[in-house]
Amino acid sequence: MPAGLRNVDTESAWSKSGYRGWVQGYRLILQGLVFPAPVPLFARWCPNTVGESTVLAEALAADHLPVTELLLGDSTFGGADLVATYAHHGGWLLTPQQLPATPNSWKRDLYAYRRETIELLFQRLIQACDLKICPTKGLARTGTFVLASVWLYQVLFLDNYRSHRPLAHIKEFIDEARWRIAA
């Protein structure tokens, strides 16, 4: 643990991210649909040291992961065994390892959409449920808080669908509920 850090969650772990360098904390793994609006289908909370591909493989083996026709994943999901397992379950797992070398290809265009879609889903979830700062510590407590936020997002999405309201108007409902509680 680096010296000088305050208020550290001692249950959390350090791991090296290809995107952010060394990070301390936990990991939320999301699978989502993009159309007609971003919504989580699957969520798993785990220590930061647990690999995403491990979680995906375990969820597939236990039939906990909804298999979609197409799953766009980053390079951590690109192992041949995992790609084959996902295909065996009826889906296509597209990762950088499956992309052709030529820059102009429909597979590359399709894969480029991954960054926009997953980042949008995480951003909407963080904003809607105010997840910038978690008020709890520990794997179980933070996991409960974060997974309850994912569940709330899913429930409000479904309610919007059934009520013929705009699907992505989730933050507005949560903000209105907060306002009513405060009043």
Predicted segments, located by residue:
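Hydrophobic side chains within alpha-helical segments
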Residues: 55, 119-122, 157
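Polybasic low-complexity intrinsically disordered regions
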Residues: 1-75, 80-88
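A short, flexible helix-boundary coil/loop motif
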Residues: 87, 109, 127-136, 156-183
